[in-house]
């Protein structure tokens, strides 16, 4: 019934944050906007009979997004070019798979280039993976991180993935593991999860 677009800072079109909800009809849109603008009742003062939120995008952020939409095709073409470079450069490297569209029937914008490393692939420095605790945010991520006592968790990328990340970091090339499965996040350890092992495998072998 709804479509969701992300305009986060790392996306093809960004408003510095936030996104958009695509609604099928006016009734749904009005209901969503009611919740997104604090769910106020029709009184000359603030009256709330349901919990509302302040989720509406500011006009400044929306203006940034509208401006970027005029050059969306340029962004897409650039990302496709970057993807083509990775496919060319890694084509002859045994043990590395570049994720790409399965056929010409698909037209990916390649907002994110990802690879998968076979667990048997050896990377220089692999023996030192996870020996040092991370001190700063990884892969261009902003914000403050919470200090930890160990570099190891019960679900983490394979040693060769971490070794390649560190190697690229030292070469000033931004890279990071793919997203950790939600059911493996400690904060959700007691939440129900329906899994088959695929997400864990992708996390252990993937890099973007």
What residues fall within each predicted segment?
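Short beta-strand-to-turn element immediately C-terminal to the catalytic PLP-Schiff-base lysine
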Residues: 5-6, 19-25, 66
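PLP-dependent aminotransferase class I/II
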Residues: 26-208
């Amino acid at each position: 019934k709804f479509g969701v677009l992300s305009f986060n800072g790392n996306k093809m079109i960004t408003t510095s944050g936030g996104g958009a909800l695509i609604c099928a009809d006016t009734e749904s849109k009005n209901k969503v906007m009611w919740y997104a603008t604090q769910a106020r009742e029709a009184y000359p003062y603030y009256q709330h009979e349901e919990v509302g939120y302040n989720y509406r995008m500011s006009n400044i952020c929306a203006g940034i997004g509208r401006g970027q939409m005029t050059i969306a095709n340029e962004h897409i073409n650039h990302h496709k070019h970057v993807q083509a470079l990775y496919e060319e450069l890694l084509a002859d490297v045994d043990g590395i798979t570049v994720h790409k569209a399965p056929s010409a029937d698909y037209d990916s914008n390649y907002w994110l280039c990802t690879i998968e490393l076979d667990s048997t692939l050896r990377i220089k420095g692999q023996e030192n993976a996870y020996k040092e605790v991370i001190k700063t945010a990884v892969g261009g991520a902003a914000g403050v991180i919470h200090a930890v006592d160990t570099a190891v968790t019960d679900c983490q990328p394979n040693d060769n993935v971490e070794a390649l990340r560190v190697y690229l970091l030292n070469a000033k090339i931004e890279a990071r593991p793919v997203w950790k499965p939600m059911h493996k996040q400690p904060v959700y350890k007691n939440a129900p999860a329906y899994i088959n092992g695929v997400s864990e495998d992708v996390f252990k072998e993937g890099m973007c």
